[in-house]
Amino acid sequence: MARIAGIDLPRDKRVEIALTYIYGIGLTRAQNILAKTGVNPDIRVKDLEDGDVQKLRAATESFTIEGDLRRQEGMALKRLQDIGCLRGRRHRMSLPVRGQRTRTNARTRRGSRKTVAGRKK
C-alpha cells in the first residue's frame, strides 16, 4: 500500500484520484505532480512500483499539505479572531463571513433552528 504524507492511498483507485485523498492536493495539483514525475495517471495505486511511489513522495514534499496546512489555516483564522476584525468576529459567532443574509437562510452555518417561545404571530 502506498503511503504518502501519512495517508494510505486507496489501492483500487487511479493514482490521479488517489492523490486527492491527501488534504491540500486537488485534482489539478495531482495532475501537475503526475506530469512532473512522469507517472501514468491511469495506473492503479496497487500497480505502482516503489520507484514511482518515491517520486510521488518527493514531489509532494514541496507543497504544504496535511497537518501543516491545517495548522496554517487554523492560525490564520485565530489571527483574524485575535485582531477583532469583522471576519474574525463572524467566524467566532459561527455566522456567514462573506456578507450573506442571515435573517433567513444561512442554516448551514448557523446550525439547526432553535425554537423561541412566543415568536408565533
UniProtKB/Swiss-Prot annotation:
Biased composition (Basic residues): 100-121
InterPro entries on file: Rbsml_uS13_C (IPR027437), Ribosomal_uS13 (IPR001892), Ribosomal_uS13-like_H2TH (IPR010979), Ribosomal_uS13_bac-type (IPR019980), Ribosomal_uS13_CS (IPR018269)
Region (Disordered) residue spans: 91-121
This protein's UniProt keywords: Ribonucleoprotein, Ribosomal protein, RNA-binding, rRNA-binding, tRNA-binding
GO BP terms in the entry: translation
PROSITE patterns reported in the protein's UniProt record: RIBOSOMAL_S13_1, RIBOSOMAL_S13_2
Any single Gene Ontology cellular-component annotation: cytosol
Keyword Transferase annotated: no
Xref: Pfam families: Ribosomal_S13 (PF00416)
Family according to the record: Belongs to the universal ribosomal protein uS13 family.
UniProt function note: Located at the top of the head of the 30S subunit, it contacts several helices of the 16S rRNA. In the 70S ribosome it contacts the 23S rRNA (bridge B1a) and protein L5 of the 50S subunit (bridge B1b), connecting the 2 subunits; these bridges are implicated in subunit movement. Contacts the tRNAs in the A and P-sites.
Subunit structure and binding partners: Part of the 30S ribosomal subunit. Forms a loose heterodimer with protein S19. Forms two bridges to the 50S subunit in the 70S ribosome.
UniProt name for this protein: Small ribosomal subunit protein uS13
Protein source organism: Prochlorococcus marinus (strain SARG / CCMP1375 / SS120)
